[in-house]
């Protein structure tokens, strides 16, 4: 089960942050207490593309943990792709042997959305061949840097815009491969570009709290 602990301020004041760990207690972060936690299982399933009752979906449920937080007045999973208020999605994947052999920094960049040129081209090509209008257009890179943690874990943090319908959505994506090469932990923070421009410092604090912890034993 998801372990969520609330840090209380001195006295009887309201909580300032919600502190979150994944079910194995190895990935943790904090979000302002004003964010509402929502069930991310349906979102994770949609991102995977697996049919709900398939064997692949059942196996994925054993390997993948996910949660989401939304600051909107009416929190909803679909705010990941159209949010006037900040939305945070976090997931931890235990990699299969095949995935361990192919993981790379570019794979970390593309873990949720198409970011690298090769993956964006493949995404648009698939949409063209199926006759579907692509949901994501007008990609704009903002920043891209490596993340190196003290325990040997490494990853990337990329920020970019996508045009989704009539709005421009900004995404701040952090993906970290643990020091054993066994798990990938991902945090995606998003809201409309005007919201992101006004609240960038707050999002930096959330992303900066995203850490890995090596457990003893």
Question: Which stretches of residues belong to each language-model region?
Answer:
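Sec-dependent signal peptide recognition
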Residues: 1-3
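C-terminal motif of bacterial Sec signal peptides marking the signal peptidase cleavage site
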Residues: 8-11
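Bacterial signal peptide processing site
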Residues: 13-15
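Proline-anchored loop/turn motifs at beta-strand termini and strand-loop-strand connectors
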Residues: 24-45, 207
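Soluble non-cytosolic domains of exported or imported proteins
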Residues: 26, 114, 118, 193, ...
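Surface-exposed amphipathic alpha-helical segments
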Residues: 35-38, 182-217
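Conserved polar/disulfide-associated segments of primarily extracytoplasmic proteins
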Residues: 42-172, 184
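A short, solvent-exposed beta-edge/loop patch
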Residues: 176-182
């Amino acid at each position: 089960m998801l372990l969520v602990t609330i840090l209380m301020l001195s006295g009887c004041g309201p909580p300032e942050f919600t502190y979150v760990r994944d079910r194995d207690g190895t990935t943790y972060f904090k979000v302002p207490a004003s964010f509402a936690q929502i069930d991310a299982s349906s979102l994770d399933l949609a991102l995977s593309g697996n049919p709900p009752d398939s064997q692949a979906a059942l196996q994925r449920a054993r390997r993948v943990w996910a949660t989401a937080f939304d600051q909107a007045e009416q929190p909803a999973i679909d705010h990941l792709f159209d949010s006037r208020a900040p939305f945070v999605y976090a997931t931890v994947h235990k990699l299969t042997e095949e995935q361990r052999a192919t993981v790379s920094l570019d794979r970390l960049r593309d873990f949720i959305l198409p970011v690298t040129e090769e993956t964006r081209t493949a995404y648009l090509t698939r949409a063209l061949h199926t006759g579907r209008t692509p949901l994501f257009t007008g990609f704009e890179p903002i920043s891209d840097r490596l993340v190196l943690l003290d325990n040997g874990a490494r990853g990337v943090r990329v920020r970019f815009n996508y045009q989704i319908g009539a709005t421009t959505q900004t995404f701040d994506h952090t993906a970290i491969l643990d020091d054993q090469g066994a798990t990938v932990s991902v945090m995606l923070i998003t809201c409309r570009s005007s919201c992101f421009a006004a609240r960038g410092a707050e999002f930096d604090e959330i992303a900066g709290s995203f850490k890995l912890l090596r457990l003893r034993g």
